[in-house]
Amino acid sequence: MATFKDACYQYKKLNKLNNAVLKLGANDVWRPSTLTKRKGWCLDCCQHTDLTYCQGCLIYHVCEWCSQYNRCFLDDDPHLLRMRTFRNEITKSDLENLINMYNTLFPINKKIVHKFANTIKQHKCRNEYSTQWYNHFLMPITLQSLSIELDGDIYYIFGYYDDMHKINQTPFSFTNLISKYDMLLLDSINFDRMAFLPLTLQQEYALRYFSKSRFITERRKCIEILHFSDNILDNLHNPNFTLQVIRNCSNMSVEWNKACNIIRNISDYFDILKSSHTEFYNISPRCRMFTQYKLKIASKLIKPNYVASNHNSLATEVHNCKWCSINNNSIVWNDFRIKNVYNDIFNFIRALVKSNLYVGHCSSEEKIYESIKEVLNVCKENEWNMLVTEMFNQLEPIKLNENNYILLNYEINWNVMNVLINSIGKIPKILTLSDVILILRIIIYDWFDIRFMRNTPMTTFTVNKLKQLYEKDRTAEHDSRISDIE
């Protein structure tokens, strides 16, 4: 069993404060929740198990038992998970406050050890101290944490996480912050606690302490789309789809890294608890991560032969053509924005191909097809620029005065005309590489302006940021027919 979970269960009986702070879903009556096969550590009870997604941020980091309380490390409520969460720069003073909170909630002294020894109903001889029955005493105070980076903000969720060698399918990575504190001082604190334990438990306590305080920090992971709820991927292609999140809120008004100090004044803590409530937010899924996911799916459906064709139809509306007809049954086309981008991109590229290469039918095989297959994946800027440069060079540009030029003398649709006029000021007859890159970008940015998108969705905002955006009516897209440029 998880040491942290056991400690919360036993120490919850100690006093009124502990009963309020150490309440875990994993130690209460189980309520069913959606399970997945993702393995990792539940941030709430610190046990390694199958995880479900959090209702507050939609990331997989909570177990099926703890999910009933809907706690998130981004909440604005003084529950234990939030008080164990630190952000960005952490000072020695902050770590001192964390250690003091641990000592307050999980004390070890002669009186406490005697009290638990008298109340624990073990099945062996009373004089034997089995780790099975005294697991809660074997949770040392360490600076072990799971960390995650969300658009420049780094969050550290401290706790006692067993079995660090086990599989981790979450975006969190183990971080050891003992270097920001005093190693010898932390040793002294734990040795003082350990001295009150029976000799048979001291050895196990020491082994656990050194294994969790001397480990090497892992390389920080990059958060990916697979770390979010599967429900998002099922609905992402609906342009009217919004993400629904639940956040725990209160009138707690302290600096982020000072939340663990609240329990110093018990009356103030319970006053804050009285103001606890939940807030619901509908949030737009617009972000670079989800946009890239949709554009990648569309890229797999590309029919590059269209750029050599003579079809009068738009690229997504060609039927009964072996080389140009796309799979219209794909869910990605439910998003009209993807269709608009696809049609305009291929209308423009076809005009370039027809203006510069001698091709007459979509059945012809051209080298330029390979360069076109990833033209929608603009999120990877360097790779995309190289791809467009390769495509430009395959259009057999003419070199004049150190610059390369290609022609544009083939018909284009009204949307592309507007892009040319807005970007260059006219409909040009010759184009440079920079012109082509600019035009292709604007066609995509018209609906998916990744320049101003966060990498992750707004579900990873703190409550304060969500409130600010909600007041400005900026958490959701109300009119899906309005483009990013508009």
Swiss-Prot record:
Its main location: host cell. InterPro entries: Rotavirus_NSP1. GO terms for molecular function: metal ion binding; RNA binding. The keyword Metal-binding applies. It is found in: Host cytoplasm, Host cytoskeleton. Residues 42-79 are annotated as: Zinc-binding domain. A motif (pLxIS motif) lies at residues 480-483. Residues 82-176 are annotated as: Important for cytoskeleton localization. Residues 317-486 are annotated as: Interaction with host IRF3. The keyword Methyltransferase does not apply. One of its GO terms (biological process) is symbiont-mediated suppression of host cytoplasmic pattern recognition receptor signaling pathway via inhibition of IRF3 activity. Pfam families: Rota_NS53. Keywords: Host cytoplasm, Host cytoskeleton, Host-virus interaction, Inhibition of host innate immune response by virus, Inhibition of host IRF3 by virus, Inhibition of host IRF7 by virus, Inhibition of host RLR pathway by virus, Interferon antiviral system evasion, Metal-binding, RNA-binding, Viral immunoevasion. GO terms for cellular component: host cell cytoplasm; host cytoskeleton. Residues 1-81 are annotated as: RNA-binding. Belongs to the rotavirus NSP1 family. The integrity of the zinc-binding domain in NSP1 is important for degradation of host IRF3. Interacts (via C-terminus) with host IRF3; this interaction leads to IRF3 degradation. Interacts with host IRF7; this interaction leads to IRF7 degradation. Interacts with host CUL1 and CUL3. Plays a role in the inhibition of host innate immunity by inducing the degradation of key host factors required to activate interferon production such as IRF3, IRF5 or IRF7. Associates with components of cullin RING ligases (CRLs) including CUL1 or CUL3, which are essential multisubunit ubiquitination complexes, to modulate their activities. This is Non-structural protein 1. It comes from Rotavirus A (strain RVA/Human/United States/DS-1/1976/G2P1B[4]).
